[in-house]
């Protein structure tokens, strides 16, 4: 298996920043408990409070794929278009 690293950047509209921050924060603990999650870190950019960055390591691509189908993510996914200032930027890396 090849370990997978994801670095994702999410930028909120200023008027939806707090709502998005809340939704994103709620994903951290359930995700960390998922099978195959090595680590899952959520950060707010030091210079732009509307910019959120995720750093994730997964045991395999299959584990990441399973994560993206988890029920706890669905409330977030259904709101993204309304909350985001631009599309999510994802860097998909292998170790």
Please provide the spans of the model-predicted regions.
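Localized chelating/binding microdomains
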Residues: 25, 54, 95
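Short, flexible turn/loop "capping" segments at secondary-structure junctions
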Residues: 1-4, 45-46
């Amino acid at each position: 298996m090849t370990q997978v690293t994801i670095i994702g950047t999410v930028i909120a509209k200023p008027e939806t920043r707090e709502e998005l921050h809340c939704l994103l924060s709620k994903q951290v603990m359930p995700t960390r408990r998922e099978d195959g999650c090595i680590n899952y870190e959520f950060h707010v950019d030091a210079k732009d409070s509307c910019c959120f960055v995720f750093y994730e390591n997964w045991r395999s691509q299959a584990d990441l794929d399973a994560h993206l189908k988890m029920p706890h993510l669905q409330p977030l996914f259904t709101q993204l278009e309304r909350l985001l200032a631009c599309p999510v930027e994802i860097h998909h890396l292998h170790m």
